[in-house]
Amino acid sequence: HYIEFIRELSVSCRKKGLVLSVDNYVPAVYNRFYNQKEQGNVADYVIIMGYDEHYAGGEAGSVSSIGYVENSIKDMLFLVPKEKVINAVPFYTRLWTGSGDNASSRAMGISEATKWVSESGMDLTWDDSVGQYYGRLDSQNGEQQLWMEETRSLGLKMDLIKKYALAGVAGWRLGLETSDVWDVIGWE
């Protein structure tokens, strides 16, 4: 039913000269019923939401590690031509408090997270395995962890978009980024 809706919507959009893009979680077994391959046949663009690798209620980790993003792009390219694929990057991160099953998190925009790191005194160290800065801090609230999204990590994601010659980049969500992010995202 979903794909039939997208088919019908695409016809109406074309008649009105509108561009139709469809956002998707990264390709996975649990979301195959969205039929990204058929979306690629009927929509102008298929967007990969290249984030929420680790999410509220799940285990602590990066919102968008570089390996996760690259694997997501490769998986989508098996289904949809590169000229129609857009990768969305996060303008946010998660501050994780606690550990194991007791971990909780809150989403923070890049600008808010940058300020929080400065005020908390958390030391960040570059982690090549995730392509992000990582920090850990013991506080009165317990262990706090952060995988920081910022210009260097977003630059690596932009490199993947160029490497695979995708149609473009999208972001979640305007207003959460710092102004220097636009220097990295600038499309050539």
Task: Mark where each language-model region is.
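Substrate-binding surface in catalytic domains of secreted glycosidases
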Residues: 2-117
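Generic alpha-helix detector with strongest preference for long hydrophobic helices that associate
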Residues: 27, 50-57, 138, 142, ...
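Short, acidic/polar
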Residues: 28-39, 149-162
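Glycan-binding loop/region signatures in secreted carbohydrate-active enzymes
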Residues: 89-160, 181, 187
